[in-house]
Swiss-Prot record:
NCBIfam families: PRK09478.1
Origin: domain of life: Bacteria
The protein's name in its UniProt record: Galactose/methyl galactoside import permease protein MglC
Native species: Haemophilus influenzae (strain ATCC 51907 / DSM 11121 / KW20 / Rd)
PANTHER family: ABC TRANSPORTER PERMEASE PROTEIN YPHD-RELATED-RELATED, GALACTOSE_METHYL GALACTOSIDE IMPORT PERMEASE PROTEIN MGLC
InterPro entries in alphabetical order: ABC_transp_permease
Main location: membrane
Molecular-function GO terms, alphabetical: transmembrane transporter activity
Length: 336
């Protein structure tokens, strides 16, 4: 084999190493239990992927700008708890706010998304105008949000918030059945969210600005892009995606606590990187994000399905994250 062919083979391995590793893991799962490959599991994987996809779409926009958001999971938890207290059934004897009537679902969506937008606004302002690095800024808001959420959670009883209205349960847990396959409503919401993000990234000036900022902030500024304003906007949009995802997650699970959303941001970031969204900025596709989320969910679901110890699952997921980021760094180093 010539040196050129060896280099090509090495480049191919480097570009696709993470997929080879994940395929090996999937092969091990199937070998351990061939019943993993069935329509019921496929339906469950799609449903579990859906909320994670909505969250990952928010995170992906930030990664494209060379940013990140460690507060994403805590924002999901805050939205879940707030929406849960607003959407309990009127017949629920443990209803948090018994004096309130049944609040329409669209009103709750608007309320939690507004809260998410405000949190995103704070993150964006701190990062864009105070020049605090995204890692530090969002780590701070992560802690603050968890504190506020825990105070609120304790104030409304400090126990899992459940007993949702029938309308909300149907909204979050409903599905269309086709034979033994169930297409959940949540999957449809995620598909709509993905379509909206695709349009935003590919068909709007704002999307082009976001990619320009990620590719080279200084060049974007020279070309007339208001970098600070666009950064604030992308963090606000991300906050709204987290909020909607948190509301859906509460409904999907059937309850909410202040710890819901823990580590969701790491899963989202890892899924984005596996799907080709670069930490170096300026690179990413919606299809890639979808692929990354589904791959990660298949691995999570599969490891649980074959009974792998949850602690080993943390070790495996952490290793995948390190490998994905390392490969991304190697790709970027070569381009530099």
């Amino acid at each position: 084999m010539s040196a050129l062919e060896k280099n090509k083979s090495f480049d191919l391995l480097k570009q696709n190493a993470i997929y080879f590793v994940l395929l090996i893991l999937l092969g091990i799962i199937i070998a351990q239990d061939p019943t993993f490959l069935n329509l019921v599991n496929f339906s469950n994987i799609l449903t579990q992927s859906s909320v994670r996809l909505i969250i990952a779409l928010g995170v992906a926009g930030l990664l494209i700008t060379q940013g990140t958001d460690l507060s994403a999971g805590r924002q999901v938890g805050l939205a879940a708890v707030i929406s849960a207290t607003m959407l309990q059934s009127m017949e629920n004897i443990n209803r948090v706010f018994p004096e309130m009537g049944q609040i329409p679902i669209p009103v709750v969506i608007l309320a939690v998304c507004a809260i998410g937008a405000v949190i995103g606004l704070v993150n964006g302002l701190v990062i864009a105008y105070l020049n605090v690095t995204p890692f530090i800024a969002t780590m701070g808001t992560m802690i603050i949000i968890y504190g506020f959420n825990s105070l609120y959670y304790d104030a409304v009883g400090g126990s899992p918030i459940a007993g949702f209205s029938e309308n909300f349960s149907t909204f979050a847990q409903g599905f269309f059945r086709v034979g033994s396959f169930k297409l959940s409503y949540i999957t449809i919401y995620a598909a709509i969210a993905a379509l909206l993000v695709w349009i935003m990234w590919n068909k709007t000036r704002f999307g082009k600005n976001v990619f320009a900022i990620g590719g080279n902030p200084e060049a974007a500024k020279v070309s007339g892009v208001n970098v600070a304003r666009n950064l604030v906007a992308i963090y606000m949009i991300a906050g709204m995606f987290y909020a909607f995802g948190g509301m859906l997650e509460a409904g999907r699970i059937g309850s909410a606590t202040n710890n819901l959303g823990f580590m969701y941001e790491l899963d989202a970031i890892a899924a984005c990187v596996v799907g080709g969204v670069s930490f170096a900025g300026g690179v990413g596709t919606v299809i890639g994000v979808i692929t990354g989320v589904i791959i990660f969910t298949v691995i999570n679901y599969g490891l649980t399905y074959i009974g792998v110890n949850p602690y080993w699952q943390y070790i495996i997921k952490g290793s995948i994250i390190i490998l994905a980021v390392a490969i991304d760094s190697l790709k970027y180093a070569k381009k530099k």
